[in-house]
Structures are given as structure tokens and as C-alpha cells.
Amino acid sequence: MKHTVEVMISEQEVQERIRELGKQITERYQGSEDLVMVGLLRGSFVFMADLARAIELTHQVDFMTASSYGNTMESSRDVRILKDLDDDIKGKDVLIVEDIIDTGNTLNKIREILSLREPKSIAICTLLDKPSRREVEVPVDYVGFAIPDEFVVGVGIDYAQKYRDLPFIGKVVPQE
């Protein structure tokens, strides 16, 4: 598909919001010695790296990979866990870090899986949220930006494995 990418949220806006989220998360977990950031790969890795630096607490990082997209622009209901956590989260404060919440299906499944492992708490932080697309209600504690139902890329979010490196959030605009 031929397309262009238009800036939707600037690099400066993204970085300012990540710093704000870092402050909020730091306040919430002040005194916790067991905060584990769980990044959902691949899309969250850029956001997670920036957020990890913005959180002024000692914390661990771990990653999971789940897939519901493939190389299309549409989310499917089929959620597959491709990589699980390396470490045990029992008794720990878990912060799931997501790039974008669309239908909520993937995140809901991951939240269910992690809940069975008996963490002390589970919170969710996402860079982008598309509330109009939600099929499953998932409690989201920290939202960078609520956006309309547009296909977006940048700050780790891809289209067919491209554009993850963009420092801004861009809207993919199909060309005829």
C-alpha cells in the first residue's frame, strides 16, 4: 500500500508527556522495592526505554511478546504469546507498558496471564489509547495520549516493521 506519514503528535509533546508519566509513576511506587516494568514487545521498547529513565526509582525490566496484528493494519482477536517473562513476578508491583491500546483484547489476555502469577499489584501504562476501538474494558492507569481511530506509527510503533524509529507519532495516510 502506498502511503505517507503525517505528524500527529510531535517529538517534544511525546517527550514531555513521558516525563509527566514518569513523575506520576514515581509518586505511586515511592517506597516499593519490587517494581517490575513489563514491556510488551516489539512496539513498546522505545517508549519503555524513555519511560524507564523518567521513573526515579530503582526498578526491574522484563519483556513479553504477544501478537494480534501480523503485517496488516487490522487487529485480530487471535492473541498469541510468543515470548514470556524471564523472571518471577510473585509479590511484585507490575507495571505493564504498552505502546497502543486498540481493542483491548491483547492487553486483557496478558493481564489475565500475569494475574495468575500472584503479583502484589498490576498497573497498565500506555503511550497511546484508542478508546473508540475498545472491545474489552481494561483498566488503564496511565495514558500518554488518547487518540482517534487512526493508524499510527513512530516511537516504537510500526507498520509492517517500518517506522519504529520515528521520534514522533505519525498518522499513516493511504495514497491512491
Swiss-Prot record:
Supply the CDD domains for this chain: PRTases_typeI
- Protein family (similarity comment): Belongs to the purine/pyrimidine phosphoribosyltransferase family.
Query: Which lineage?
Result: Bacteria, Pseudomonadati, Pseudomonadota, Gammaproteobacteria, Vibrionales
* Keywords assigned by UniProt, alphabetized: Cytoplasm, Glycosyltransferase, Magnesium, Metal-binding, Nucleotide-binding, Purine salvage, Transferase
One GO cellular component term of this record is:
cytosol
Compartment(s)? Cytoplasm
Question: InterPro entries, per this entry?
Answer: HGPRT, Hxn_phspho_trans, PRibTrfase_dom, PRTase-like
Q: A single Gene Ontology molecular function, please?
A: nucleotide binding
- What PROSITE patterns does this protein map onto? PUR_PYR_PR_TRANSFER
Protein name listed in UniProt: Hypoxanthine phosphoribosyltransferase
**Which cofactors go with this protein?**
Mg(2+)
Give the intrachain disulfide bonds: none
Q: Which residues bind diphosphate?
A: 42-43, 164
Q: Which residues bind IMP?
A: 98, 102-107, 130
Which PANTHER family does this one have?
Answer: HYPOXANTHINE PHOSPHORIBOSYLTRANSFERASE, HYPOXANTHINE-GUANINE PHOSPHORIBOSYLTRANSFERASE
